[in-house]
């Protein structure tokens, strides 16, 4: 084992970074965030970027820049946890010890869960405001909608991660279509 932490946070998204900052302010010991992404995106803005209300690049920072002072960054993904031994193993084989573990790794799209989903995205007639890599495609798709076109918004069943945010993207798109005369 190379490192030992009082608190290991798996995930460097908004939740992980915010928690790490709060723990450091409260002087809760040695804190680390394990996240292999090199880029941090402020995800609440994804809907606005997809809806043409914001430029996503304004809400992206190098991961190192958002790690709070005094918090260590392990630039790797955790792939296994041994609760009894209080250790985590990263994708490169690094073993990290911890007293307390916080899991907030975020979500990873499961493209194979729906037959044809990958093909729909590749063809350009499906999009998501919740997958950062597809925000620009979502914006382009929504901008091509013309009067009389049909738009289908999929709202996930609860419990889901921020299920209502799908409606926010839809309302932003409707507002844009209303401004341009596509919607009466």
Region roles according to the model:
Residues 2-72, 159-184:
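Beta1-alpha1 glycine-rich phosphate/pyrophosphate-binding loop at the start
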């Amino acid at each position: 084992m190379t490192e030992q932490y009082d608190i290991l946070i798996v995930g460097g998204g908004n939740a992980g970074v915010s928690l790490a900052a709060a723990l450091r302010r409260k002087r809760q010991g040695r804190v680390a965030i394990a996240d292999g992404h090199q880029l941090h995106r402020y995800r609440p803005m994804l809907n606005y970027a997809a809806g043409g209300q914001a430029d996503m690049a304004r809400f992206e920072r190098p991961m190192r820049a958002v790690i709070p002072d005094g918090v260590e960054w392990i630039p790797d993904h955790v792939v296994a946890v041994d609760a009894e031994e209080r250790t985590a193993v990263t994708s490169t084989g690094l073993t990290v010890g911890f007293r307390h573990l916080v899991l907030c790794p975020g979500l990873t799209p499961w493209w194979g869960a729906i037959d044809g989903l990958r093909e729909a995205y590749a063809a350009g007639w499906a999009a998501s405001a919740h997958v950062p890599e597809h925000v620009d495609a979502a914006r382009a798709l929504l901008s091509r909608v013309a009067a009389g076109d049909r738009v289908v918004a999929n709202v996930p069943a609860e419990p889901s991660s921020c299920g209502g945010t799908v409606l926010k993207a839809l309302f932003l798109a409707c507002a844009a279509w209303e401004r341009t005369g596509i919607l009466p």
